[in-house]
Amino acid sequence: MSALKSSAVRRGSGRGSGGRRLLRWLASVVLLAALGWFGWLYFEINAVAEQDEARPADAIAVFGAAEYLGRPSPVLHARLDHAVELYREEIAPLVITLGGGAAADSGMTEGGVGRDYLLANGVPYERIVAETQSVDTDQQVARLAEIAQMRRLKSIVVVSDGTHLFRIRKLCEDAGLTVYTSPRPALGHIGDWDLAQRYFHEMLSYTLLRMHLDFGWMHGKDSG
């Protein structure tokens, strides 16, 4: 009787060990897959961030960032300056500024502030389209697609931060847009920690996007 009990215990223990081995194997596979995915994603984001694809197109689109009581933040300022430079180089005859404002704001919008800045820097009023309703990157792309369809724009140069452009391009492609990415110049030295945060934000945001998980706080506009 004792021998039978001992044999049963060994069989149960063997099944338990086998189950634990399977779980460890599955965990290893998931970990390796995640490392491979995020490694590929880092490479792709970095490749887009370091390449300026600006070329003749139908329009230039400036993705929104924070504005402070009617004044563009340093990040938005740099994006708009880059758009002005592209316009002066005759890359495109039209500049689209994207971005709305929070309910608690002064009533100003990123798109409206961008339009005013472009006007002050020599871009004619009739050459500017200000989009003022979107509240995040996804909505900016959706509104850009509507503008492109309405105005029959076949190609657009999109301007934003380098690390932001990979996700923008993928969203634009999903919306049926032909876009060329053009990163705005860096603002001074970016610390390793800040840069790592930017990459982490974009990698996680894009992953959630592809998993069809909607966490607005993860894929909003830049605040700087």
What is each residue range found by the language model?
Residues 1-11:
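Short, intrinsically disordered terminal tails adjacent to the first/last structured region
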Residues 3, 40-199:
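A structural signal for short, hydrophobic/glycine-enriched beta-strand patches
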Residues 10-52:
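N-terminal type II signal-anchor transmembrane helix
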Residues 14-17, 21, 188-191, 198, ...:
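Coil-to-alpha-helix initiation sites in intrinsically disordered, low-complexity, charged segments
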Residues 25-32, 130-136, 161-170, 215-224:
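Electropositive, surface-exposed helix/loop patches at the edges of structured domains
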Residues 192-222:
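A transmembrane-helix-recognition feature enriched in membrane-embedded lipid enzymes
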